[in-house]
Amino acid sequence: MASGQGPGPPRQECGEPALPSASEEQVAQDTEEVFRSYVFYRHQQEQEAEGVAAPADPEMVTLPLQPSSTMGQVGRQLAIIGDDINRRYDSEFQTMLQHLQPTAENAYEYFTKIATSLFESGINWGRVVALLGFGYRLALHVYQHGLTGFLGQVTRFVVDFMLHHCIARWIAQRGGWVAALNLGNGPILNVLVVLGVVLLGQFVVRRFFKS
């Protein structure tokens, strides 16, 4: 992925330079595979848990994956963490989407506004996981409301947002996406979950539903 300015919002100044071991651009490139893997395993988890109550999205079911790749494993690990986030806060994701009623025309605007609010007070792994979770929910919501083939666009939303809002740089400074493989242990995970989704029922709803 080119490092120059492309479509989307101007890139923010991100402070410290990225570590040479995992460049910002490499993280942005890896994000696509991480998100695809995350989506596949999250969708699989819901299918197994809910059965016919959770209609399958054919695009998610047939995603091309490399399960043994490092980025594939990262996506799976984040899906496990995301499953915990979803169990605790799914009703707030659903309420948000029902109120906003995203379409192909306005989905990028809504995604960007909500994602920007998520990281307004800083970046941490919990918020990164919540961002992937919201991208998944957005893609599934749009599919369930009659628009097929939208997952690729949501993937691009996630990649572009991470690159233009310093998140790819932040991940690179921590060694790249591979660092996420060490997140799933007890107290650390609980802290990340709380920090990652605390705004969903408060800040986002207040800003977008009451404006």
Swiss-Prot record:
Highest rank taxon of the organism: Eukaryota
Effect listed in the UniProt record for changing residue 164 to A: Strongly reduced zinc binding and homodimerization
Tissue specificity of this protein: Expressed in a wide variety of tissues, with highest levels in the heart and skeletal muscle.
Keywords: Acetylation, Apoptosis, Host-virus interaction, Membrane, Metal-binding, Mitochondrion, Mitochondrion outer membrane, Transmembrane, Transmembrane helix, Zinc
GO biological process terms on file: animal organ regeneration; apoptotic process; apoptotic process involved in blood vessel morphogenesis; apoptotic signaling pathway; B cell apoptotic process; B cell homeostasis; B cell negative selection; blood vessel remodeling
Keyword S-adenosyl-L-methionine: no
SUPFAM superfamilies, per the entry: Bcl-2 inhibitors of programmed cell death (SSF56854)
Pfam families: Bcl-2
Binding of Zn(2+), residues: 160, 164
Keyword Mitochondrion: yes
Similarity comment: family membership: Belongs to the Bcl-2 family.
General function of this protein: Plays a role in the mitochondrial apoptotic process. Upon arrival of cell death signals, promotes mitochondrial outer membrane (MOM) permeabilization by oligomerizing to form pores within the MOM. This releases apoptogenic factors into the cytosol, including cytochrome c, promoting the activation of caspase 9 which in turn processes and activates the effector caspases.
Recorded domain comment: Intact BH3 motif is required by BIK, BID, BAK, BAD and BAX for their pro-apoptotic activity and for their interaction with anti-apoptotic members of the Bcl-2 family.
Full protein name: Bcl-2 homologous antagonist/killer
Gene: BAK1
